[in-house]
Each structure stands twice: as structure tokens, then as C-alpha cells.
Amino acid sequence: NIDGVPLDVNSNMQSTVGSGMIITPQSGYADDKRNTTRSGVDMRTIATDDIETVEIIRGIPSVKFGDISSGVVTIHRKKGYTPLRARAKADGFSKLFYVGKGFELIENRLKLNFSLDYLDSQPDPRNSFENYKRYTASARAEKHFDTENPLTWNFSIDYTGTIDKEKRDPDVGFDRYDAYQSTYNNIRIANGLSWELHKTFFKTLVLKTSYSQSFDR
């Protein structure tokens, strides 16, 4: 759940072809770590630099979170003014680059946030022939309307692309043509309205809509 919008993976029915295939002897069977069917959201696809708070609910959460029966992780991203921030990180496991900026137009009661993120991860530093690359882009807006009953509008558009790849090490006596690669591209659009009703039985009316399209192969 990101900014009140569930991340639904119910339609993901893909699994790795050739579950018994071994790309390199030290990596084990390919399907052991790549089959994510019925296992929830792949947390590697979520950029962390935009996160402001994280809430973890154990057990069966409220119905507002959707058809969840084993807990939920709620992520709230940064909103409003933030200075231009660029970050680069490199270690034995990953390389990461991030740039983001937030604007707040006080007169217009409008907040805008933009960010780009790139990650090149090496899950096992002993196996230099396997990597996981992720790139994300995000644009978010929040607008407050000064009416008798305050109205807040939220909009966001997010893109995530990943490449998961492994190939044989020619130094261990295997042919190089035996390789594994999967790509994933997702675009998600979310729109929300929150209307505060101070003098009625209903305190707040909330309407949220979202559209998500994925290309996974």
C-alpha cells in the first residue's frame, strides 16, 4: 500500500520457465529465487529515497486495505517542499543513483514532487554474472481547495522498470549461450479526493481510483 493505494499482484500468474535449470553451479536452481507467483509484492521494485514513513499492521487489517489477510505494509511518500537531493551509493552488493526535488506553491496551495532512481544490485557478490537492475520515475501532486468543507486532491504517476539477468561463467567450463533474463515494466496512475464534512454524520468522504499496467516477460 503506497499513499493509500494498494499494490495488487493478484493477476501475476507468471513463473520461471525451466525451474530445474542451473545457470551457474553456485547459484542453485533458477526457480528457487525467481518465482514470485502468489508470494506478494517484490519489495525490490519500490524506491526507498522518497519514503517518509512506514506503518506495519500485523494480523488482519481493515477492509479499506483490500483483500489482505496476513498483515499490510503502508508506505507514505514525501509531499511538499524538499531541497534538490542527489545521492550516489556503491558497495560490494549494489550501485544506486537518485535525484529528487519537491516544490510547494503556497499561494496556490499546491505541492509537487519529482524523482528518478536507478539501482544495479548484485544479490550474491560471489556470482558476478547475476544482477538485478531497477529504474523508477515518479511525479506527484497535492492540491488543497479552500472551501467551507476543505477538499484535497492527490495525483501520482509512477513508472518502474526492472531487468533480472544471469549468464554462465565461461571460466567454469560451460558454454556462454545458456543465460537467463527477465524484464518487467509497470506504469501506475493514482487519483484521490478527500472531502471533510464537519457538520454531518460522515466526517470525511474519500474517493480513490488507480490504474496499473504491467509488461512482464
Predicted regions and their residues:
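Short acidic/polar hinge/loop motifs at secondary-structure boundaries
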Residues: 5-57
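Transmembrane beta-strand segments that form the barrel wall of outer-membrane beta-barrel proteins
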Residues: 77-78, 82-93, 112-122
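N-terminal periplasmic accessory domains that precede
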Residues: 1, 40-44, 67-87
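Residue-level detector of the transmembrane beta-barrel scaffold of outer-membrane proteins
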Residues: 53, 85-87, 111-115, 152-156, ...
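Transmembrane beta-barrel architecture of outer-membrane proteins
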Residues: 38-41, 70, 94-98, 134-138, ...
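Solvent-exposed loop/turn segments connecting transmembrane beta-strands
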Residues: 65-68, 88-98, 125-131
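Flexible loop and strand-edge segments within Gram-negative outer membrane beta-barrel domains
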Residues: 119-138, 142-204, 208-217
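Strand-connecting loop/turn motifs
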Residues: 49, 81-83, 96, 105-111, ...
